[in-house]
Structure formats: C-alpha cells, structure tokens
Amino acid sequence: MYRYNILLVIFFLTSCSNLLFVPVKSYPLTPDAADILYEDIYLTVDDGVTIHGWKMLADKNKIGTIVFFHGNGDNVSTQMPNTFWLAKEGYDMYVFDYREYGQSQGKANLDATISDMELMIGYIAERLPDEEKMIVMGHSLGGSMAVYVVAHSAFRDKIESLITVEAFSDYHEITQEVLSKSWLMWAFQWPLKFAIDNSYRPLDSIGLISPIPVAIIHSDVDEIIGMHHARDLFEAATEPKSLIVIDSNHSNVFVTKDNRQILFDYLKTLKR
C-alpha cells in the first residue's frame, strides 16, 4: 500500500499542471439559439496554434465591449447562460476558448493560456475605436488568470474595468482545498498543492491593476471556491475596487434576474 501511495503521488506530481484544465470540446449551444448575431474568430498565436472564439454582436444600441474568460470545465458554448444576455443588453461580447477547449487547437497549460489571453485582449484593443475601452471579465479560473493578465497587459490603456466572478486568490490554496474534499487525495493535499505553478498568483497581481477599477463578484454560498478568496482579493486590491456579494452556486451565476441586475448596475457606474 505504501508503494502504491508513493506511485500515486509521483503520478499526480508529474501531471498536476493539467489539473487546472478540464477541456470541454462539445458545443450544446451557439449564439443563434438565442437570436444573437455572431462572428467566428480564429487567432493564430505565436507557436502556430489556432484559438477559436465568438464575437456576439450587441442586440441594440451598443453600450460597450466585454471580453469574457470562462472557467476550467467550460467553453464558450457552455457559458452562454452567463454571457448571451449581455449582448441582449447592448454589449459586444467576445468569448474565447483556451487551447484544447471547443474548436481551439493545442494543449492546455497555464503559461500558454496566460500568453494567449493577452493576445486575445490585444486583438480586441486593435479593433476598438480610439475613444472606446473594453471590460475584461472572467469566471472562476478565467477570473483568476485575468487578474495577472490585466495587471501586466500592454493594453491597459484600453481596459475600462476588470470583473472577477467566483475567482480564487491563490493556486496553491485552491488546489489544497479541492484535494481535501476527496477521500482518495486528502492525505496528499499538502505535497500536491506545491506541484501547481503559483507564479501567476492573483494575490500578487491584483494590487497592480489600479487605476483600472476592479469588481470582485462572489457568492457567499459558492460550493467550490469559498468567499474568503474574494475577501482576500478585495483586501489586496487597491482603489478603485468593489466587493459585490451575490447568491448563486458556482457555475450558473447570471441565470437569475437579480444577479444580472447586480452586474448591470455595476456596469452602469463605469465612465464612458
């Protein structure tokens, strides 16, 4: 049994970087199911890999532009319940799949995904009118990665706000918390958490985002990422910043009218 446990730890240590990503390929929905006009986007990144995304066109007089980064077990299609309604409210919505997700090529890993997200932001920035900025929004892992990307982006002058939704504050901490809930992996939570790359730790970057406004949206009943992550991020952030507490499970955040209105109320506070 001891030998088996050691082999199990070695296996997870060699593959832990991929624990962050659970690629989803299938598309249950496309924007036309919600009567939204959209365009397919294909970006070729530095190493020749092609990344796929959608631009959902504002359904009424355009208010602004949002780029949305999904979590680790989703793709642009499965996250449509959290995004399509913003196009209905007047936002051009850009959504992209990470490597290995949806129609995107390549193999998912943290370094490449962080780099690809910056390229996606640059793609949008180059197409915005001079007077317009984009809002960067990320859910779960997408929000945590977006903290680092926005803090270090070469396109900060084109970013109006960062909005994180159910994001975590530390890669080591969330890894330990997730493993601690598994009877099989409970005993290995301490060594395995250090196998995850923490170079892009959100707590180290969120204080660098100012003067770009940051909104941290989190449910106090999130069953996967605890509310303490949001509080830690809020404490580490510098003004202007907002902590917005909602009532939701982890995934289906904006399926309710109340939570949609909460987000829309924040969006209305941003200067145009």
Feature map (PLM): residue ranges:
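Short alpha-helix in the alpha/beta-hydrolase fold that links the catalytic acid
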Residues: 82, 202, 226-235
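Hydrolase active-site cap/lid region
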Residues: 148-204, 255
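Alpha/beta-hydrolase fold nucleophile elbow
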Residues: 128-140
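Alpha/beta-hydrolase active-site loop
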Residues: 108-128
